Amino acid sequence: MQSAMFLTVHHDCGPMDKSAGTGPKSEEKREKMKRTLLKDWKTRLSYFLQNSSSPGKPKTGKKSKPQTFIKPSPEEAQLWAEAFDELLASKYGLAAFRAFLKSEFCEENIEFWLACEDFKKTKSPQKLSSKARKIYTDFIEKEAPKEINIDFQTKTLIAQNIQEATSGCFTTAQKRVYSLMENNSYPRFLESEFYQDLCRKPPQITTEPHAT
């Protein structure tokens, strides 16, 4: 059910084709496409915000309180362009970035990174071991359901490290995935119509004084 909302977008983890010819009609067509894309973006993000959960935390039978996300001001959204960490530090920014990656079918990267962040905060050796195995089976091993793109040597090292799990088991892989997102997905997110719309300041309404 959840994945069905994202099947209308491109699958190649790259920007959409912007070619739509030239001339007034083509310009009108492009503007219509942009409005449609922006509307789809807002629908996807709204759905994602209502149904998102931390990938590092297991789901329980109890109903969890819905997370509250406050839409940023244009000035706050513009800060996300200064550094990738600024985007990740914002709850709304992180949720928007996750929705963006999901629309490009690349969400495994941010989900792995978040799972590693949760993993590093774990204190109990028993929980550390069980979480390490889950991250490995979800993201690392061959044909994992959310397999990330890392080299064979790093995968082998992780397989050895999780036998006696420590908080640094996934450090190398997490750094590589972070770098991949920072240099690839992050710039495309900043160019997306959704992000550009967040940065736009609403037009000021001026009222003319009544003639006396």
Curated annotation (Swiss-Prot):
Its main location: membrane. Phosphorylated by protein kinase C. Phosphorylation by PRKG1 leads to activation of RGS2 activity. Residues 32-66 are annotated as: Necessary for membrane association. GO terms for cellular component: cytoplasm; cytoplasmic side of plasma membrane; cytosol; nucleolus; nucleus; plasma membrane. Keywords: Cell cycle, Cell membrane, Cytoplasm, GTPase activation, Membrane, Nucleus, Phosphoprotein, Signal transduction inhibitor, Translation regulation. It is found in: Cell membrane; Cytoplasm; Nucleus, Nucleolus. Gene3D superfamilies: 1.10.196.10, Regulator of G-protein Signalling 4, domain 2. GO terms for biological process: brown fat cell differentiation; negative regulation of cardiac muscle hypertrophy; negative regulation of G protein-coupled receptor signaling pathway; positive regulation of cardiac muscle contraction; regulation of adenylate cyclase-inhibiting adrenergic receptor signaling pathway; regulation of translation; relaxation of cardiac muscle; relaxation of vascular associated smooth muscle. It holds the Pfam family RGS. It comes from the Eukaryota. GO terms for molecular function: adenylate cyclase inhibitor activity; G-protein alpha-subunit binding; GTPase activator activity. Residues 11-33, 48-69 are annotated as: Disordered. Residues 83-199 form the RGS domain. Signal peptide: none annotated. Residues 79-116 are annotated as: Necessary to inhibit protein synthesis. The keyword Ligase does not apply. Regulates G protein-coupled receptor signaling cascades. Inhibits signal transduction by increasing the GTPase activity of G protein alpha subunits, thereby driving them into their inactive GDP-bound form. It is involved in the negative regulation of the angiotensin-activated signaling pathway. Plays a role in the regulation of blood pressure in response to signaling via G protein-coupled receptors and GNAQ. Plays a role in regulating the constriction and relaxation of vascular smooth muscle. Binds EIF2B5 and blocks its activity, thereby inhibiting the translation of mRNA into protein. PANTHER family: REGULATOR OF G PROTEIN SIGNALING, REGULATOR OF G-PROTEIN SIGNALING 2. This is Regulator of G-protein signaling 2. It comes from Sus scrofa (Pig).
